[in-house]
Amino acid sequence: MIETIEQLRAAVYGQAVGDALGVPYEFQDRDSFACANMIGHGTHNQPAGTWSDDTSMMLATLDSLIGNDWQVDIEDMQHRFNAWLYDGEYAIDGNVFDSSYKRNPQTTSFR
């Protein structure tokens, strides 16, 4: 079990770091930049190390799974997604940026 937890922890860190590396370059052509360091600003004008909705939603998903003894509870998961989207939970400094989810009737109807 410890090995599985360590693998999960490594995957979560890898996701968050990779996401933060990519945030400044989102929507840019792959050949238009060289990512050599963690930088800030760029596409979303966020500080270096800021992750996006991808990591926030992964954290909300994991929080739901852990809170429900690793069972999928769709309603709980949706509540956690809404906590991210509307209250800034799982987001750095509570700042939700670049989210089209607030305009999506499928996500807002569950609120």
Residue ranges and their predicted role:
Residues 1-111:
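Structured, active/binding-site neighborhoods that engage oxygen-rich ligands
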